[in-house]
Regions:
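Start-of-domain marker
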Residues: 21-85, 89-92
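Residues that define the transmembrane beta-barrel architecture of outer-membrane proteins
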Residues: 27-31, 64-66, 103-107, 146-154, ...
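Residues on the lipid-exposed face of transmembrane beta-strands in outer-membrane beta-barrel proteins
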Residues: 35-39, 70-74, 109-115, 128, ...
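Short loop/turn motifs that connect adjacent beta-strands in outer-membrane beta-barrel proteins
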Residues: 41-44, 79, 116-122, 162-172, ...
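Transmembrane beta-strands of outer-membrane beta-barrel proteins
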Residues: 47-49, 82-84, 120-126, 152, ...
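Transmembrane beta-strands of outer-membrane beta-barrel pores
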Residues: 51-57, 86-92, 115-117, 128-132, ...
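Outer-membrane beta-barrel "beta-signal"
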Residues: 111, 231-250
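Outer-membrane beta-barrel transmembrane domain signature
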Residues: 126-211, 219-220
Length: 250
């Protein structure tokens, strides 16, 4: 029981330390919406899909990001799996590209594992990304070629039931998570630490395979200039849909 609490405490300390105010920290308010689907169609194979929309500022003003991600999953065990896939991200017009969107192509690989205890559950993943972001010529025109860097992400999520029937359908649980992002590559100069995403909220378990998570998320990000930071205060709503199709085939 001590191990997951110790890991979560470590990431909470990282979150709080990273979020200390600086002279050049910009604060924005956003809404993050997401849908996740994991479908298992055999003992060893499955597929991954998630899609996201994020607003830009003042919670409902303009769009910032649209993202779609797909992957093929290989199950090492029921609670441990490897996934590799591709993501496409569209960054809507922003400060350095006011009249055009910036596309990004992002291959990714991931190790994910779940641990169940009598009164809590944890989920962790280690994700490796290769980011190809289209270069920008001006506010109105994309340039040829892409900026490239690698990014490593580690996510730790802790779920605690809020009823005697732990994680049963039509019950709630409390959810706390922290995800740390690290950049590396030739084009990364100042922001090796990319960002930390800290989330605290609730999950409503609709049934054995669906749950709705909602709550507050803070994203503390170091920008490429190195001396500028962004603190995003977000309302986050994610829907998780997990399907086991093996029984349907029998």
């Amino acid at each position: 029981m001590r191990k997951p609490y110790g890991l979560m405490l470590l990431f909470m300390v990282v979150s709080v330390a990273a979020a200390q105010p600086t002279k050049q920290t910009a604060n924005v308010e956003q809404v993050w919406l997401g849908y996740f689907n994991q479908a298992r169609f055999s003992d060893k194979w499955g597929v991954w899909l998630d899609v996201h929309l994020r607003t830009k500022e003042d919670f409902a003003k303009d769009m910032a990001v649209a993202l779609g991600r797909v992957g093929l999953t290989y199950y090492l065990a029921d609670n441990t799996k490897l996934t590799a896939g591709y993501a496409f991200i569209n960054f809507f017009p922003s400060d350095n590209h006011r009249n055009i969107s910036q596309p990004e192509h992002r291959p990714w690989q991931q190790l994910q594992w779940h641990t169940k205890y009598s009164k809590l559950r944890t989920m962790q993943w280690l994700r490796f990304e290769q980011r190809f972001r289209r270069k920008i010529k001006s506010d109105d025109e994309l340039a040829e070629g892409h900026n490239f860097n690698y990014r490593l992400r580690y996510n730790f999520l802790l779920s605690v039931p809020l009823s005697k029937q732990a994680f049963a359908p039509r019950t709630f649980s409390g959810v706390v998570s922290s995800e740390v992002f690290v950049n590396f590559g030739k084009e990364v100069v100042y922001n090796t630490f990319d960002q930390n995403r800290f989330f605290a909220g609730f999950a409503y378990h609709l049934n054995a395979h669906d749950n709705l998570q909602f709550g507050y998320m803070n994203v503390f990000q170091q920008l490429a200039a190195g001396n500028r930071y962004r603190s995003t205060h977000a309302i986050r709503v994610f829907y998780f849909h997990n399907l086991d199709l093996r029984n349907a085939e029998k």
